[in-house]
């Protein structure tokens, strides 16, 4: 499914002058495909597309082919924008393209919400983590099951004894406070266990330099369309689902998965080894269409 956002609404996705660490603080823990566009802190006129994907935050440099910002009515050539091998007339056109084409493991789904952030950059040290002291099966559909030792991220504290949290697979729900304890990640604030940035992520001062290399988008990788026939994928990352989630697929590297439904959340549905269930699309790599002779 393509992203559901208005690429012409610049105010919804453009964050202005912001360094890499600040973007990470906003995006880590967000679901796959949540993004923002910011100014490059190293090259005036260039931009950076920061995206939550594959349990990390990726940063894609957007080069301005010309740094001429003057109006074309004055006879000046307008800037074009290059990301990887692709070139676009405008930033909205670029965003539209990546609504239906993969960057690496995700398409663009929606901008990170400015209203939820209240215009204030969320520092990593403000993100609270918990460690499970006991197994929790869950009693209601809104509960988040977990096992002893799991690391969870607090999203909200609506009640004294029940908080809303997120696990490492992106599942969210209510958890009983007596079952968990406060947890501080052992690494620096630039890295987190859930949705953390796996690039060079040393904290930088406001407006500081861009550390680490930029990611490179895939070349012409469109979002698959199930209407064109069955879609198959090969498992590239082992997955052992929560023992209490009977709808989740267990995956072994090399398994063949027949994709039956593509959800915008990033949790796809499919068949693997005769079983049906959901799985994170980041754990598989799509194959060429219709390799049915290989499916068993």
Curated annotation (Swiss-Prot):
Marked site positions, Proline switch: 230
Gene Ontology cellular-component terms listed: cytoplasm; plasma membrane
BP GO terms, sorted: cell migration; enzyme-linked receptor protein signaling pathway; ephrin receptor signaling pathway; regulation of actin cytoskeleton organization; regulation of cell motility; regulation of GTPase activity; regulation of intracellular signal transduction
Region annotation Disordered: where it falls in the sequence: 180-221
GO molecular function: receptor tyrosine kinase binding; signaling adaptor activity
Occurrences of domain SH2 (ranges): 13-112
Keywords from the UniProt entry: Cell membrane, Cytoplasm, Membrane, Phosphoprotein, Repeat, SH2 domain, SH3 domain
Superkingdom of the source species: Eukaryota
Keyword Oxidoreductase among record annotations: no
Residues annotated as signal peptide: none
Domain SH3 as annotated: residue spans: 125-185, 228-289
Residues the record lists as Phosphotyrosine modifications: 214
Sequence similarity: Belongs to the CRK family.
PANTHER family on file: ADAPTER MOLECULE CRK, SH2-SH3 ADAPTOR PROTEIN-RELATED
Record note on quaternary structure: Interacts with abl, c3g, sos, map4k1, mapk8 and dock1 via its first SH3 domain. Interacts with bcar1, cbl, pxn and gab1 via its SH2 domain upon stimulus-induced tyrosine phosphorylation. Interacts with several tyrosine-phosphorylated growth factor receptors such as egfr, pdgfr and insr via its SH2 domain.
Function: Required for apoptosis in Xenopus egg extracts. Involved in cell branching and adhesion. May mediate attachment-induced mapk8 activation, membrane ruffling and cell motility in a Rac-dependent manner. May regulate the efna5-epha3 signaling.
Name listed for the protein in its UniProt record: Adapter molecule crk
Organism: Xenopus laevis (African clawed frog)
Gene: crk
